[in-house]
Amino acid sequence: MKVFSVAVCVLFFIMACQSPHSQVLSINHELELVIADYQYYKDHQSPFNRDISGDTNAQLPDLSPSNLEQQYLALKVIYQRLAQVDVGKLSQDEAINHAVLSYTIKNQLDNYINHEHYMPLTAESGFHVWISRINGQVSFKTEQDYRDYLARLAALPKYFSQQMFWMNKGIDEGITQPKIVLQGFEDSIKAFIKTDVTTSTYYQPFSKMPAYFSESLKSQLKTQAAASISEFVIPSYQKYYDYMVQRYQPSARDNIAASSLPNGEAYYLNRLQYYTTLPISVDDVHEIGLAEVARIRLEMDDIITQLAFAGSFADFVNFLRTDKQFYATSSEGLLKEASFIAKKMDAQLPKFFKTLPRTPYGVIEVPANIAPKYTTGRYSGPSRDDQAGNYWVNTYRLDRRPLYVLEALTLHEAVPGHHLQGSLAREMKNVPKFRNSTYISAFGEGWGLYSEYLGVEAGFYQSPYSDFGRLTYEMWRACRLVVDTGMHAKGWSRERAMNFLADNTALSLHNVKTEIDRYISWPGQALSYKMGELTIKKLRNMVELSLGENFDLREFHDQVLKNGSMPLSMLETIIIDYVEKKKVVLKEEKQ
């Protein structure tokens, strides 16, 4: 006992004598321990999160009530430990780690409390689509890789049953997607129900196997794959299709507002503040949206005047929506045009960025099974280091995919938008592993919208129609602030929201419908684009005013992107710190 007492006294003495620097090291180490525990949790929370090979490659996530509760309790402990860290004494790198991890874990806890797992679907997609991408999770190089994959196919019935269990809980508790956004949703399920199993997405790994496999092994694996798809995959999708049509859609809620859900007002405010990363109110977001709509409308009207168009704003928009000159005549033509724009921007990147990613990207079609209800385009990052990223372009209904918005779309989704930003984050060195894969919507989508604006400085939008298309896309994001808050918190109907979006943009009416349904089914996410872009532009303006002729745009962009995704408040702290340090350097250079 005396030895223990002496040891404690010595420990207290050492702690009391610690310098501020050593205290920072101690606090940083404390945070490192929390991060290590979180990473261990994350690696074991889902078999998709592990880097190691073994039994987990043959598993699917366990969505049982007991497992989800255990995950929640484990996260809660980690979050409590994280909250005890003295953020004011952290180094900047560790402060970023703390901010990103706090934001991430809080959302995971909130999602469990708000029963987000009761609704594993949106208007445009769902778990049945997400799980179909398991063939991209691993490299198929060994026989064991294929056998693990076959084991995952055998686990699909349980996985689908667990998802439907939670959806039934949602029905019982009034937590479902609105009925209106589910019209035609069953078609995305039916697309996976194949008569010829060799045409199934799940069969793709067996279509081209390693050349070093013997023919007998290839034949054996193909036979087993066909049997597994017939026995496990197709019946799972058929069961889900029947459930969707016979049970879920008829039982879905009629009210579109998130505020109509149990504890709905608090839930929507939670989603709003999560997706904007800001302590902001519904009313403030709505008013910012209205102000942005009015400002952008003036710029759009100026272009119509410059073109000497005889007619109203509505007439001009109708002209854009219906004139064949603005639409590609083939899927290949649309993809080629998108590819040309992307390559053209590639050549401009060194003018705007000091640091560029190594990861390449391709331009491909949105998969046909989800295209009808899917958004215009999207970026899909690689899931392995032997893959490229992909800029998805929706070629469904070409008469609804105007070319005048393609420059803005491409810059947003490919470069300098999501591909560049996401690849730099994945390629970051000397950061905790979770940072490489963290995506914070306000940061990422804000950067995407800002990237559309960079096209002006890069010499894009030379045609007044494409410039109007750029403004249409900016107006689209401004309208989101209005319609998302309007529908989920202010009693707006779906029709009112559709009319507002249609009246203020040149989006096709098909896109207007799919977009509004997306916002209904994904409360708050649509707010991240404009709120993030406004923050990045505000910070750029602040740096330009502070540094004057010493402002370096390439350096500013590197400062924004070099640390990956983060809450906007943390980004502001970093940029302010950069300016202060830059001023010190400039002052020293003058002496």
Annotate each language-model stretch with its function.
Residues 19-591:
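N-terminal maturation segment of proteins
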Residues 2-9:
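Sec-dependent signal peptide recognition
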Residues 15-16:
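C-terminal motif of bacterial Sec signal peptides marking the signal peptidase cleavage site
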